[in-house]
Amino acid sequence: MFGLSKMLRVGEGRAVKRLQKIADQVIALEDQYANLTDEELKAKTEEFKDRLAQGETLDDIFLDAFATAREASWRVLGQKHYKVQIMGGAALHFGNVAEMRTGEGKTLTCVLPAYLNALEGKGVHVVTVNDYLAKRDAEWMGRVHRWLGLSVGVILSELRPAERKVAYDCDITYGTNNELGFDYLRDNMARSLNDLVQRGHHYAIVDEVDSILIDEARTPLIISGPVDGSSQWYNVFAQIVPQLTRDIHYEVDHRKKTVGIKEEGVEKVEDLLGIENLYAPEHSQLVSYLNNAIKAEELFERDKDYIVRNGEVMIVDGFTGRVLAGRRYNEGMHQAIEAKEKVEIKNENQTLATVTLQNYFRLYEKLSGMTGTAETEAAELHQIYKLDVIQIPTNRENQRDDLTDLVYKTQEAKFAAVVDDIAERIANGQPVLVGTVSVERSEYLSQLLTRRGIKHNVLNAKHHEQEAQIVAQAGLPGAVTVATNMAGRGTDIVLGGNPDILLDIKLRERGLDPFEDEEAYQVAWEEELPKMKQRCEERAEKVREAGGLYVLGTERHESRRIDNQLRGRAGRQGDPGATRFYLSMRDDLMVRFVGPTMENMMNRLNVPDDVPIESKTVTNSIKGAQAQVENQNFEMRKNVLKYDEVMNEQRKVIYSERREILESSDISHYIKNMVDETISAYVAAATANGYVEDWDLDKLWNALEALYGPTFTWQSLVDGSEYGAPGELSAEDLRTALLEDARAEYAKLEEAVTALGGEAQMRNIERMVLMPVIDQKWREHLYEMDYLKEGIGLRAMAQRDPLVEYQKEGGDMFNAMKEAIKEETVRQLFLMRKQFVKQDEEANA
């Protein structure tokens, strides 16, 4: 990975120079576009569309379109793109990741490429990490696009399908990665063209691209439905596990996140259940319940890995600190945690449709992204998504002071020192942002601050709705904000307060909405913004004198990038600022990787609990541990992708055929091919031995009877009545006779249905039969593929490559599924033929 990163950086230098040249050319057009009237500037949109319609390309109108959007942003928002923002916008248009430091205005940067690419009329998707940011950006940046005559939509979790379709039909659509991915899956489960909401995957700009394409890449998007299963065993084992003792009855590997039951544990569980052998075939499922119950107890921590809200267990993303709404652990893990927390146990689910974010975003013809920290992941973004990372220079020189880590023996001593440091900083009027690794830690620190009488705001998965308001005020003099890792990411902490967000809050309190009352909102905005900016600037000056924003990390994250993101909140736009991490020997990362050596040394030297050490050994150990974990996670994501690649190719085939069937007004040729291929497959299987006397024609006819019901017997063929002397019947003769018979019977079905409702009715029936069969067989296939993947690792014990075996067996299973779709569709259609015959007989009786 290191070598690739180095090579990428070499090419990056040339790219930056090219972007600087482009930005200079756009800036050179500033006076020309500033002299246009509002009407003339707005008319540019139609002019650009006409030029594209006449054969020009986006690159031909690139400079003019950027200059137009830049001038419109100034007139509508009072914000003009800096040179570095134009560079970032150009990098996005060319399909790169623009790495722009916190505070450099990524949201405004996005306006330029979104406007340019929307002119093609194929749709632009701007992807954010949560509903709030999607709605905020659609409202704020959407004001520029709407002013220029483009339509803007936003996909929110509560929208109905019809509303989603309207939003996707807009020129520019804002939404979260989850909502876009789930809509893609739902579209590929639709039974009617009217149920489709997305119109394709043309161009996506992914905000916080590292969070979406890397941190969340290991977790697939899954639409599932309940399956039958008993929840009693989850409760039984939730009561058994607390009676077991770690290291005596079972062992835990926190690094690998695995558990193992020991012989003593097996005996104890057998006694508690009153059974003889836990591993007997009739008890085989109990081992899975036991393992999940132990994992729920040992590896899943409340308020860190999940929270319980309104009687529901909700997963917390370990990287972002945000709740993953609608996501559930699979393979019974979620139910085991529900049993542990004594809340309602919901049914286990069967996968109906699934896709990884990696493969969803690779659907786009052009993909780009923005982030403040992507350099450490440049190689992964290039290998998996073919995205190059370009570091955009800062608008002003960075003045942030990154102080050395302080290491304490205990967590209690560490947090006491943290509170002391906060108290000292705010006494001087300096705002403080405190980063924690979990909801639990943020609330623990909140309690300590409350005891000291220190006013503060808490920003974590439990307080998601107040996120913007809290972050907008985090830069006020003496403000204290406690946040989980990336809570609040996407919203700048501006020294003195964020004037845009504070004004938006004020206008909404007055009852003005940028969507509903766009004109009145714009008038009030232009009137109030200068006053709000002045008030914030006066406060900002006081904060600068106090040293700027102080960012305090209470623990190192296993990813350097997450640490860098936290640090990056300080020192935006050339402001002063400082950062420091407080660590303890009992922090998760220290326990896992630094080990007891350092703690033993501190004990030997009699270092008091409240005295920190600054050690290069510890710092280097942490860096090494982070690099090790990052490499492990990268390998895991690559492994997920390799296995999902098998499913992805199969998914593309099924979804493509499904869409073709959905869009076709006449699928009779599909059905007739299915009839021919199914009959041919039956005959081929029955006549594989080659000699008539070896054929099991009774078995073949029984199968054909269940399939469609031949109008003649095999004896009538073999006895020579139709094919000369007995024994001269060939497999091809048999196939030809059966094909003619089946086709004739299907023609009778078509005649009967057409007589009742016309030919269109027959075509509708064919589609109504085929679509549910495809969906049912695909669901069964997904289940079987999951089952195959669970056990495929054991093939390594037989010196076979699990991935190769998975590809081979998965391919065989996919081919079998396609045959099963044909067979079941043909069977159901001929069943209708039999029903028509029966109705005729009853009518004539």
From Swiss-Prot:
The organism sits in which domain of life? Bacteria
One GO CC term on file: cytosol
Provide the protein's localization: Cell membrane; Cytoplasm
User: Example GO molecular function term?
Assistant: protein-exporting ATPase activity
By its UniProt entry, which SUPFAM superfamilies does this protein fall under?
Helical scaffold and wing domains of SecA, P-loop containing nucleoside triphosphate hydrolases, Pre-protein crosslinking domain of SecA
Q: What reaction does this enzyme carry out catalytically?
A: ATP + H2O + cellular proteinSide 1 = ADP + phosphate + cellular proteinSide 2
What EC identifiers does the entry list? 7.4.2.8
Q: Which membrane topology describes this protein?
A: Peripheral membrane protein
Instruction: Could you list this entry's UniProt keywords, alphabetically sorted.
Output: ATP-binding, Cell membrane, Cytoplasm, Membrane, Nucleotide-binding, Protein transport, Translocase, Translocation, Transport
Q: Which GO terms describe its biological process?
A: intracellular protein transmembrane transport; protein import; protein targeting; protein transport by the Sec complex
Q: Where does ATP bind?
A: Q85, G103, E104, G105, K106, T107, D492
* PANTHER family reported for this sequence: CHLOROPLAST PROTEIN-TRANSPORTING ATPASE, SECA INNER MEMBRANE COMPONENT OF SEC PROTEIN SECRETION SYSTEM
On assembly, the entry states: Monomer and homodimer. Part of the essential Sec protein translocation apparatus which comprises SecA, SecYEG and auxiliary proteins SecDF. Other proteins may also be involved.
Known role: Part of the Sec protein translocase complex. Interacts with the SecYEG preprotein conducting channel. Has a central role in coupling the hydrolysis of ATP to the transfer of proteins into and across the cell membrane, serving as an ATP-driven molecular motor driving the stepwise translocation of polypeptide chains across the membrane.
The UniProt entry's sequence similarity note says: Belongs to the SecA family.
The name on file for this protein is Protein translocase subunit SecA 1
Organism of provenance:
Corynebacterium efficiens (strain DSM 44549 / YS-314 / AJ 12310 / JCM 11189 / NBRC 100395)
